[in-house]
Amino acid sequence: MWVAKWLTGLLYHLSLFITRSWEVDFHPRQEALVRTLTSYEVVIPERVNEFGEVFPQSHHFSRQKRSSEALEPMPFRTHYRFTAYGQLFQLNLTADASFLAAGYTEVHLGTPERGAWESDAGPSDLRHCFYRGQVNSQEDYKAVVSLCGGLTGTFKGQNGEYFLEPIMKADGNEYEDGHNKPHLIYRQDLNNSFLQTLKYCSVSESQIKETSLPFHTYSNMNEDLNVMKERVLGHTSKNVPLKDERRHSRKKRLISYPRYIEIMVTADAKVVSAHGSNLQNYILTLMSIVATIYKDPSIGNLIHIVVVKLVMIHREEEGPVINFDGATTLKNFCSWQQTQNDLDDVHPSHHDTAVLITREDICSSKEKCNMLGLSYLGTICDPLQSCFINEEKGLISAFTIAHELGHTLGVQHDDNPRCKEMKVTKYHVMAPALSFHMSPWSWSNCSRKYVTEFLDTGYGECLLDKPDEEIYNLPSELPGSRYDGNKQCELAFGPGSQMCPHINICMHLWCTSTEKLHKGCFTQHVPPADGTDCGPGMHCRHGLCVNKETETRPVNGEWGPWEPYSSCSRTCGGGIESATRRCNRPEPRNGGNYCVGRRMKFRSCNTDSCPKGTQDFREKQCSDFNGKHLDISGIPSNVRWLPRYSGIGTKDRCKLYCQVAGTNYFYLLKDMVEDGTPCGTETHDICVQGQCMAAGCDHVLNSSAKIDKCGVCGGDNSSCKTITGVFNSSHYGYNVVVKIPAGATNVDIRQYSYSGQPDDSYLALSDAEGNFLFNGNFLLSTSKKEINVQGTRTVIEYSGSNNAVERINSTNRQEKEILIEVLCVGNLYNPDVHYSFNIPLEERSDMFTWDPYGPWEGCTKMCQGLQRRNITCIHKSDHSVVSDKECDHLPLPSFVTQSCNTDCELRWHVIGKSECSSQCGQGYRTLDIHCMKYSIHEGQTVQVDDHYCGDQLKPPTQELCHGNCVFTRWHYSEWSQCSRSCGGGERSRESYCMNNFGHRLADNECQELSRVTRENCNEFSCPSWAASEWSECLVTCGKGTKQRQVWCQLNVDHLSDGFCNSSTKPESLSPCELHTCASWQVGPWGPCTTTCGHGYQMRDVKCVNELASAVLEDTECHEASRPSDRQSCVLTPCSFISKLETALLPTVLIKKMAQWRHGSWTPCSVSCGRGTQARYVSCRDALDRIADESYCAHLPRPAEIWDCFTPCGEWQAGDWSPCSASCGHGKTTRQVLCMNYHQPIDENYCDPEVRPLMEQECSLAACPPAHSHFPSSPVQPSYYLSTNLPLTQKLEDNENQVVHPSVRGNQWRTGPWGSCSSSCSGGLQHRAVVCQDENGQSASYCDAASKPPELQQCGPGPCPQWNYGNWGECSQTCGGGIKSRLVICQFPNGQILEDHNCEIVNKPPSVIQCHMHACPADVSWHQEPWTSCSASCGKGRKYREVFCIDQFQRKLEDTNCSQVQKPPTHKACRSVRCPSWKANSWNECSVTCGSGVQQRDVYCRLKGVGQVVEEMCDQSTRPCSQRRCWSQDCVQHKGMERGRLNCSTSCERKDSHQRMECTDNQIRQVNEIVYNSSTISLTSKNCRNPPCNYIVVTADSSQCANNCGFSYRQRITYCTEIPSTKKHKLHRLRPIVYQECPVVPSSQVYQCINSCLHLATWKVGKWSKCSVTCGIGIMKRQVKCITKHGLSSDLCLNHLKPGAQKKCYANDCKSFTTCKEIQVKNHIRKDGDYYLNIKGRIIKIYCADMYLENPKEYLTLVQGEENFSEVYGFRLKNPYQCPFNGSRREDCECDNGHLAAGYTVFSKIRIDLTSMQIKTTDLLFSKTIFGNAVPFATAGDCYSAFRCPQGQFSINLSGTGMKISSTAKWLTQGSYTSVSIRRSEDGTRFFGKCGGYCGKCLPHMTTGLPIQVI
């Protein structure tokens, strides 16, 4: 371990050394950047695969060049890793160039400098450069980089934002691409002085408009802007076709649409010069970051950033005028960008907005240049002002571009007051300035709301047009899928070259040679292209063969369910209820799109009209700002705001514009009126979420109800009649035209001028009281205006006097009578006035009346309240209730009231009292006072909420009390002996009650005190049986046994079995059963080959699986036990047949008796590798003669040639031994073996030409001369072997070899070696050796001397062995003790293993008994009881006597018990606390000068009790309570005459005084009390003063101000005069001296109790409810300073103020930890997703079987398709090979016969929340694609015995909040099993490959598959 730490430290310091070596080679531009940084590092990124593994050094990756022709295709995904700031960063990147338009163009203005740009080169296609992704697999940590010319971009880490860029050389050139290219990385934390001066932007749209146009001309400003737009659009519309009208069709609001911001980027000359040829890559990297920020789901909308044009200005005069003034530069750029834009939306070069990136400082003034950007607010669709500028500051500029672009979308800063209302506590993209704690990748909730409102209110219509051509996306198709391996070889080595088989495909691309003279395979040390197939369902990715389904894909957002409707926005007049849904099922991830569709829905509510006299809803919203001048210059503090209707644009009708009463100035006070506010006075449409929506006169959304001409909603025009008339006579002055009554509607008055020209007749309007509303007092209103009739909601429009047709009109119902007049002056032409209006029918108006006897309303109070009847409008005929509108013209009657709830009373009641605060002496206690409802008739009292008693004065909540100074407590005896010696027992003791004076009391006197008389003891563990894990089944098939070791242990020590209960000893053997063994099956014997004499007969012998009834390969059965398939047979002797008779045999009979005969196989044609075997085959007749093969044609011909395979060996060398000499020259040696599958074989199987050296020379330091007189003796070399080269005896591999026959052609035949009996050295292998003749029949005679061995040793290396240390000390010197030692399992090289790797039965004991002899005379220590404590209070000691006794209880000398440890004879004890003296602070000196006395209070105090009698303290230690003091020297004083005063203005005095002042020797005025007043002569005169009233005011003395506890205070009385005049107010009372007061003052003494009493005290209210329903929240209460009379005061001391808020914890949301709890506590029986508290974190769990008694918990797998298990079905026909280098191929020599094959995919997995394990065998939420179901995290195959696993499993718990524990282990089962498991760094992903012949892996049965919360 320490070596690893040392190496880590060394590598760290080496990395620092390498980093520092780059620091001096900066380009001037980067050097200037570095100077502004507080920290930076230089790193060298490494390209890695997705598991973080570095690619081989031989594989050189050439980073992409910034050119249109790529040297190599860039991968769709890539990974880089580097270490900086003490952290490891891995960037997982995916190609993304979607922010570039398909028609993206680059424009150069001015002539580029020679050498920096290629004049003839077209625009570079840099789409292959840009990538985005995540850091360390964390979704919240984003990364955006360009890979061209290095890594340039930014990413977010745990500690903030980081920026990365390749380092440029000082001469401006780049470092060569390759592995050693240095990069500069720095954090956002620029140095403080630099950072504090930077702001995103300090000039907003409102400020710019404020300086250019005053607010009161807001409407004119809009009109001017509209005129300018019409001019621009009108000028261009002549040449622009209108074929794209669909693009500007108005979309439905409050629906999420995709938006496309087409942007033009302009770089000024300084930026172009600074970045040179890297400019395009740099600018587009910035825009790639911007596009990623606008893709973040926190913005709440789907917004695409599309770069359509990049303009590069090489000469300043070619671009806009740029100077230090930011506002001017912005204005110039906005004008210039219009010339670069094509207003046709379908044109590829059209842009919605434009950005200027400049290196010029952006200043708001000459002295203030701290802005990073500037833009207009909300002008994204304004072609004149949709533009912004940004100062280039490196990669950080991407965030400022995103920020300024947000302003054009109407988003304000995160510190905006509106954002504060939304409780935005953290800054995001729209932070007001750069800060250390901002999060620039995401958007605040406030910004999200701004963007959504901006788009929903129609200001982003221009962003709806999607580019006609598809946005360019990098192809996701991998290159290897287009060019297979053979095609790649042809491209690399020429036509005809193909991929080499049997080699790891994905590591390197190996290809065959095209030159016949040089056969073999070649590679360029690069892997094949990503996407090259490497097996079924697999392909190559970054040098690895991975599953095609493991790719991370973007996740598009989907809408969640609708939330409940909100409360109604209005109580009457038509309110709105809204419901929303969120894009969170799921949320968009990995760059997925935001949801598209409706996000809000609405419905009308409370549609009844408001009662008469109710304030207008918009007027009410304006009045909320009354008295608020909003920091607007010129607005008074008592301002009154009125609603503004005229002069407001159509789009702005739902904003709250209010005007200052009495003026025409109006201002925008809120961006949005409340839902349900009418859009205007002339319409019934209402505002919803800032938009004007259609509504009817019935206040219902989308209603078609309209008001008829009579003013009735939904009426039929039958309830009124029209009055018309003409007035045309006049005289000078005002003439009455017509009187319009209340209730009239549709008033229309028109005055036609004389001869169509303006004349001298003017309409005027007045109310019933004669007050003119306009044109009164011969003053005319020439312009159009709207008049609100005071006290009504009636609005009357007037056209203005300067019109040929002067008009007054109003559609509303007139609530008051008005008078129409005409003013005639000048020429006195007759006026021509036409009027018309509607009035209700008289008979209809009498049909309705008010009914004051409607239903009773609710009682105003709980007790002793009032209630009134509701007044309703009814029809006189049938008394049916109708709308109140029908009675609006009638006066409202008085309400009918009555008393209610008279059967009860509300009272304050004391329901409880606390204990007295002082147990001894005076104190106070708290009263629990609550409001109680007392039932008069029933006599019952019920507690109600305190607010019901709010009109009654609440009694004080504290009262005085007195403690009895008696304290009680429990005293105890000693504990008894424990009932058990181990495993948890119990002991007890006696208790009795005593007081503080030592007197025993009855137990009930202490019953309120806690008493402990029993407690647990000896809770340590008893010896118990322990068992190791079960071994694997001792058979590979069929029934067998498994074993384990069982021992008795105490903690970790082993004891003899006698210490444990034998009856509970676990079993050490257990039966086990595996799959049915394959066995040999024989058929019946066939007929004898002859009809007489000797012959043989054959039978079928097959290897079968009886359970599956399947025939297997013979290799599946044990060769040595194979039954014979041939035996001899003897029939009756044959009669002699002569040659003549033979010749006469029928030919047919000869043919029928012919059969095939074959010999044995020859040795393999090669010594190792793949070869052939041969044997002879011939047709023999009945006489065993060679016959024509046609005679045997009726039988199948046996094969003559057969493929054979013998593994080849390879040389393996051990470690070199130490040099044979200690100095000078020597030799070193090592062992070299020919190995095959970790087994040494004969050296003939290895190539002797490449055999490694076994010996070499070594040189050390020269030997000293003093030691060179005698030659050193030769040293024998030692052989050092590495751990993977075991030293074994040389074995002869005679597998399948033939020994030459020694007896009549007979020969030994050998079978294959069986499996090794041990996994390490010391094992044995068996094989069958039989003697056969040349025909393959069993024979009895072979040369015994040449018989091959049937048995050989085997094992890949030395076995681990038990090793143990020395015994420790015995725990006892006699009477039986134990001693222990360390016993471990380890290899000879020292590597320590777990115990189960060694033979458990041979483990040496680690604990044994010792000193079993009896102790001498069986003596022991006797312990007397403890004495009482030596101190009555405080600390003391207890003592006891301990002496040695024998078995007869006789006392002995202590030396006889020396072998036994003596118990302690004393111990510390503590009684009650001792009282102590307490001294207060010294009082002031008794004199002001000279010598005096100081005093202080000293008393005896007991901590926790308070003051006690002084006899309880030690008098000798009492502090002094008095001491002498000395003030300044006394001085002489005298009186000085200051002249005579006039008569005093005070009362009661009847003379004036000559004022005398008391002064010292230096004539300094001093206090008069130090001077003798008898020496002052007074003269006076009589005065007449008014009479006086006097009061006596008492107040507390200051003695109690700082003294709390037991002390005294004196109530001081002083007199105050009150003059009789009424002008004086109470706060001007003046105190005068006592002698002047006719009231006798009283002086009283009171006792101060605990805390000082004040004139006012803090009063607290009730705690509010917790601010959250679950988790940690805040509770608040009111804390006020109140006098005893209940008045507010400021006399309370702040340091005594109680807290006004405190934390609270509501655990409702965390109270459920299992689905069972949810089922029981919430009575839920529905399966579904619920949130559970698992180990302190809220996790979403699927609860299944909720209708059953025991529900189950399942974890939903977000990446469902990446959770699968597979048992591979193919089996190699030759299992002793691994073709295609372990990759899967469908054309393998395989059969698909594995019975257990299957493939299962999981969507949910069951978890056990108690053990925190996954139930891998629960398949409820799984889908088996084919074959058998496979448990979770399990894989296997029956493919190969050559470490070539094909079975796979995958686990991906990303997004679930859980991960696999690091303690997870996998167990292997079967034969020849091998396992390879990869784990991600965060533990959420596992990928495993398992298999054998046959074999599988599964989670360990002991630990299961443990999981834990992330």
From Swiss-Prot:
Ranges of residues in domain Disintegrin: 468-555
Cofactor note (record): Binds 1 zinc ion per subunit.
An example Gene Ontology molecular-function term: metalloendopeptidase activity
Chain positions covered by the region annotation Spacer: 724-846
Annotated GON domain residues: 1711-1910
Record keyword Metal-binding present: yes
PROSITE patterns: ADAM_MEPRO, GON, TSP1, ZINC_PROTEASE
Glycan-carrying positions: 92, 191, 445, 702, 717, 728, 809, 870, 1061, 1456, 1542, 1572, 1763, 1781, 1852
UniProt-listed GO biological process terms: apoptotic process; extracellular matrix organization; melanocyte differentiation; negative regulation of apoptotic process; positive regulation of melanocyte differentiation; positive regulation of signal transduction; proteolysis; signal transduction
Expression sites by tissue: Very sparingly expressed, although is detected at low levels in testis, prostate, ovary, heart, placenta, lung and pancreas. Overexpressed in several brain, colon and breast carcinomas.
Record's signal peptide: 1-21
Entry superkingdom: Eukaryota
Disulphide-bonded residues: C334-C387, C363-C369, C381-C462, C419-C446, C489-C511, C500-C521, C506-C540, C534-C545, C568-C605, C572-C610, C583-C595
Peptidase M12B domain location: 259-467
Alphabetized SMART domains for the sequence: TSP1 (SM00209)
PTM characteristics: The precursor is cleaved by a furin endopeptidase. Glycosylated. Can be O-fucosylated by POFUT2 on a serine or a threonine residue found within the consensus sequence C1-X(2)-(S/T)-C2-G of the TSP type-1 repeat domains where C1 and C2 are the first and second cysteine residue of the repeat, respectively. Fucosylated repeats can then be further glycosylated by the addition of a beta-1,3-glucose residue by the glucosyltransferase, B3GALTL. Fucosylation mediates the efficient secretion of ADAMTS family members.
Keywords: Cleavage on pair of basic residues, Disulfide bond, Extracellular matrix, Glycoprotein, Hydrolase, Metal-binding, Metalloprotease, Protease, Repeat, Secreted, Signal, Zinc, Zymogen
Gene Ontology cellular component terms for the protein in this record: extracellular matrix; extracellular space
Cellular localization per UniProt: Secreted, Extracellular space, Extracellular matrix
Entry EC no(s): 3.4.24.-
Active-site residue list: E404
TSP type-1 domain segment(s): 556-611, 846-904, 905-961, 966-1023, 1024-1073, 1076-1135, 1152-1206, 1207-1264, 1304-1356, 1358-1416, 1417-1475, 1476-1531, 1535-1588, 1589-1652, 1654-1710
Job of this protein: May play a role in tissue-remodeling process occurring in both normal and pathological conditions. May have a protease-independent function in the transport from the endoplasmic reticulum to the Golgi apparatus of secretory cargos, mediated by the GON domain.
Full protein name: A disintegrin and metalloproteinase with thrombospondin motifs 20
Organism from which the protein derives: Homo sapiens
Gene that produces this protein: ADAMTS20
